[in-house]
Amino acid sequence: MTGAVPGAGYRLAACAEMLFVDRPFLERVRRIADAGFLVEIWDWTSKDIEALAASGATIVSMTGYVTGNLTQPDGAAQLLAGAARSVAVAERLNCPALNLHGTGLGEGGKPVRPVEVVTGTDWVAAVRTLERVAALGERAGRVFHLENLNTAVDHPGTPFARAADTLALVEAVGSPFLRMNLDLYHAQIGEGNLIELVQRAGDAIGEIQVADVPGRCERARERSTTRRSRPRCGRWATAG
């Protein structure tokens, strides 16, 4: 199976970092593939790349950097070097999309260099760095996705975290090799209005990620917010 949704313009992938977590990573990937889904992985530096390539799974998204950030000269150089290494791994895995964040994330998803105030200079530097990332993607035939995060719960101090921020950066670069990874879990926590957000982002979206709020699961259905919007977001994506 290919993860295709009949009658829809999108395919479904499942994240191997979040499922079957009591199992070895390669087994998680195989279980997801056997269930008919495409596969997403995160940090490739801790993975057995050759084993993943031989697994038979279709890996469609992976982290596209190792360290660094978008704004500081040394951080941008690190990010671009890591992006080049990531592209080489993506080619080995035949993975079409590589994921980025507004800054490098460390232990527990916290930014390595927290930023409380993003300046105009930071915005200009971020666009310049992302232009170089997009150029790298164009040369390699891969698309980089810039993901929004939330600062209230999971990633405090992350610059360019809001969906509105990531969308603005993607639109400023204006390259088909840099798209938005619209994470509805993070967007619901940080901004809400998911349907309007999907409509606003439109063609800038390269990927949409879905997890329930709170807690990325459906244990507390009576408190869930994203689950009420998911069907309508899906219908809009299919129609679009």
Task: Enumerate the language-model features and the residues they cover.
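Active-site-proximal loop/turn and secondary-structure-junction residues that shape catalytic pockets
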Residues: 18-20, 43-45, 65-66, 102-106, ...
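Flexible, glycine- and charge-enriched loops at secondary-structure boundaries
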Residues: 25, 76, 80, 115-123, ...
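Surface-exposed, active-site-proximal loop segments in enzymatic domains
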Residues: 64-81, 104-122
